[in-house]
Amino acid sequence: MMKISPSILSCDFSRMGEEFARMEKCGADWLHIDVMDGHFVPNLTLGAPIVKALRPYASIPFDVHLMISNPLQYVPDFLKAGADILTFHIESDSPVEETIELVRAGGSVPALSLKPKTPAEAVFPYLDRLGMVLVMTVEPGFGGQSFMEDMMPKVAAIRREADRRGLNLDIQVDGGISEKTIAAAAKAGACLLYTSPSPRDP
């Protein structure tokens, strides 16, 4: 079953609490919170205190996507802030297994994200310890980019490997999602899409 997780990158940052409540009311399954530090990616967004402040505005899961250097250092802060899923990049400078285990020990779901140039096989050693894998279909750091359909073989490869092992693994795609690109993502094996929060209350 396909799930939808709106990204905060297209929110009105002056009304984020209202935006979160609206997205839940409109039927969002999760909320995708992009955390950027200006180092791992060139843009800069928000940190754990803002995530904590937003937690009361929605009851659906918060998927916090750490596009930051040294995510291991900041995992405890985001766990305390109310992150239900913590996604960090396999390309970051933190030890992958240690970071996964810290997230698991804190009671949240660990997830790994791959930049477009990173092959699917990079996450295979960790699949048994993950709740999900995020495949970037744009270069991370900015909204409004075009969907990279050539990432779909990567999604399909991860789905095949997860199915071969009998894993109940969520696979998400992030970037350039629209009505035109959903079908390609679903066909490749993605089950969760990160989108811009465009729907409005009826």
Q: Where in the sequence are the language-model features?
A:
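Generic structural signal for well-ordered alpha-helices
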Residues: 20-21, 48-52, 75, 97-100, ...
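Single conserved hydrophobic/aromatic residue that forms the stacking wall/gate
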Residues: 194-202
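Alpha-helix-loop-beta-strand connector modules within alpha/beta enzyme cores
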Residues: 48-63, 108, 152-165
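Hydrophobic faces of well-ordered beta-strands that scaffold small-molecule active sites
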Residues: 4-7, 31-33, 62-66, 86-88, ...
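Glycine-enriched alpha-helix->loop->beta-strand junction motifs that scaffold or abut catalytic
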Residues: 27-28, 58-59, 80-86, 104-109, ...
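Conserved N-terminal beta1-alpha1 strand-loop-helix module at the mouth
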Residues: 1-76, 80, 129, 179
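Conserved anion-binding
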Residues: 85-154, 161, 166-168
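Catalytic cores of alpha/beta
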Residues: 73-77, 118-123, 177-190
